[in-house]
Amino acid sequence: MSLLPHLMRLVEEQHLSAADAEAAMQIVLRGEASHAQIAAFLIALKMKGETVDELVGFARAMRAMAVPVSPNLEGATLLDTCGTGGDGAGTFNISTVAAFVVAAAGVHVAKHGNRSITSKCGSADLLEAWGIPVAMPPEATAFAIREVGIGFLFAPAVHTAMKHAHPVRVDLKLRTVFNLLGPLTNPAGATAQLIGAPSSHAAELMAGAIAALGLERGFVVHGSDGLDEITTTGPTLAFEVRNGKVERRTLEPADFAVAIAAPEDLKGGDLARNLEIADSVLAGAAGPHRDIVLVNAAAALVAAGKADTFLEGMALGVVAIDSGAARAKVKALADFAASR
């Protein structure tokens, strides 16, 4: 099999069917395409523009070739909070901190993420600074999700076939379809998600894709300021996915009873700065950093069915932080990893 026929169709601005997209991704993941071919494929796809069918096909191939992580929750909801990364906004690790808040509120979390590729500090970088090794064996990660309430799915460890495309991504230093696919390919089978998208168009595509892929409930969000999170600087476009249906919504800071923030209030920095911010939020410090973590945790709790409304989710998040439970989840995961 060759990637070239699929590449030529993209060059001619023809869309791939879901089946053809799946076949093309299988070629990439099996190492049957050169780096030059992969780079050309990614750029041609980016210039043409991705479709829902293409995302569905790519995601199916990646899911099928991922290392399985099976927490065996016996019907309990499993949530992922994952952005596409690389939004260029320079914020701190909002979805990662929110994941621990959600776990402390009683929802099992399978946090899917990676090291920084196009930003200064990825979710994996922050976790390691907390003493949490990110590349635990799948069995250990599954146990952590089940018993600690949260586990980290390190993309290179669970998507080992991505090693064939990783050097290309690093060299290109561009956001590609793989940024969109990360949140669509959780190998633990998350049934609820809060997904951050890099644009309103990408959010709509990703929502259509996860609906087609069978997600029970979730939100795909894009802030008006460009954040791949629910922002607190203004409105956020949200696509709510529920049992195959997609509903377009606009979320405002007032929906969560938080003050409107200035963009500079949400800035992070390098690993040291992001660690400082994350620690201060989990220690209970008030301010815009806390607000945006709570807002995203609240939406995640609604997606998981733990809260019926965003305000209920906010209340659960406040308790999780101010009781020390969220910070305790960080320590519990670090202690669990150290004991393995």
UniProtKB/Swiss-Prot annotation:
Enzyme Commission code: 2.4.2.18
A Pfam cross-reference name: Glycos_transf_3
Keywords: Amino-acid biosynthesis, Aromatic amino acid biosynthesis, Glycosyltransferase, Magnesium, Metal-binding, Transferase, Tryptophan biosynthesis
Biological function: Catalyzes the transfer of the phosphoribosyl group of 5-phosphorylribose-1-pyrophosphate (PRPP) to anthranilate to yield N-(5'-phosphoribosyl)-anthranilate (PRA).
Positions that bind 5-phospho-alpha-D-ribose 1-diphosphate: 83, 86-87, 91, 93-96, 111-119, 123
Binding site for Mg(2+) 2: D228, E229
Pathway: Amino-acid biosynthesis; L-tryptophan biosynthesis; L-tryptophan from chorismate: step 2/5
Identification of the protein by name: Anthranilate phosphoribosyltransferase
Record GO terms (molecular function): anthranilate phosphoribosyltransferase activity; magnesium ion binding
GO CC annotations on file: cytosol
Residues the entry annotates as binding Mg(2+) 1: S95, E229
Names of required cofactors: Mg(2+)
UniProt-listed PANTHER family: ANTHRANILATE PHOSPHORIBOSYLTRANSFERASE (PTHR43285:SF2)
Enzymatic reactions: N-(5-phospho-beta-D-ribosyl)anthranilate + diphosphate = 5-phospho-alpha-D-ribose 1-diphosphate + anthranilate
Organism: Solibacter usitatus (strain Ellin6076)
Cofactor note: Binds 2 magnesium ions per monomer.
NCBIfam families in the cross-refs: trpD
